[in-house]
A protein has these predicted regions:
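Terminal amphipathic alpha-helical/low-complexity segments used for targeting or macromolecular assembly
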Residues: 1-28, 129-130, 135-180
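Short solvent-exposed loop/turn micro-motifs enriched in small/polar/acidic residues
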Residues: 22-24, 34, 80
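Left-handed beta-helix
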Residues: 27, 33, 38-39, 44-45, ...
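Short hydrophobic/aromatic beta-strand element in the GNAT-like acyltransferase core
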Residues: 49
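Short, ordered loop/turn segments at secondary-structure junctions
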Residues: 75
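A generic structural signal for short coil/turn motifs at secondary-structure boundaries
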Residues: 78-79, 102-104
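Regulatory activation segment
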Residues: 78-86
Length: 180
């Protein structure tokens, strides 16, 4: 477990909570005590610039890279009047560097095993095992071989690393002929 992950786990400590919050702030992280975080959280690059809204739930085995933001799409509205209720990031999801997940209204759910690409701006819920990218984010593929389920208590079942995409396959002219 990394130092940052250990600090995140201890942010609700009765006596040390405030000190832990300040230590996380030195890393540029804002993880309120109200956030619900499941086991097996992985934070890469010390999470520099990561900000989570207090109404955030992270499932088991979630991976966060640096610069991830989870929050409201209407920050100018007082919290009590906001249509946003919660952001739920389900088990095994990966939020890549600079990903923004912003909820307009109700509950926004990032499906189990979903990957949100670098610098993507996700404003709607996703299904399980999907790959989302772009601004605004749109579905660009699915995680081939990804299946829900966990081993060792917290890490996702490995997948083949391949993905299926909606983009056309390479043309026949771009594929080298097989050697005899």
């Amino acid at each position: 477990m990394s130092l940052v992950t250990a600090l995140i786990r201890r942010r609700r400590h009765r006596l040390l909570g405030r000190l832990v919050q300040e230590a996380l702030a030195l890393y540029g992280m804002e993880v309120p005590a109200a956030c619900e975080i499941g086991p097996g959280l992985l934070v890469y690059h010390r999470g520099f610039g990561t900000v989570l809204h207090p109404y955030t739930t992270l499932g088991a085995g979630v991976t966060l890279y640096n610069g991830v933001t989870i929050g409201r799409a209407d920050p100018w509205v007082p919290q009590e009047e906001s249509a946003m209720r919660r952001v739920v990031v389900e088990d095994g999801a990966v939020l890549c560097a600079g990903a923004k997940v912003v909820c307009k209204e109700g509950v926004l759910t990032v499906g189990a095993g979903t990957i949100v690409g670098a610098n993507a701006v996700l404003t709607r819920s996703t299904g399980p095992g999907e790959i989302w990218a772009g601004v605004p984010a749109r579905k660009v593929g699915t995680r081939a071989g990804w299946e829900p389920g966990y081993t060792n208590g917290s890490r996702p079942v490995p997948h083949s690393g391949k993905r299926t995409s909606h983009s056309p396959s390479p043309s026949a002219s771009s594929v080298a002929p097989a050697k005899p």
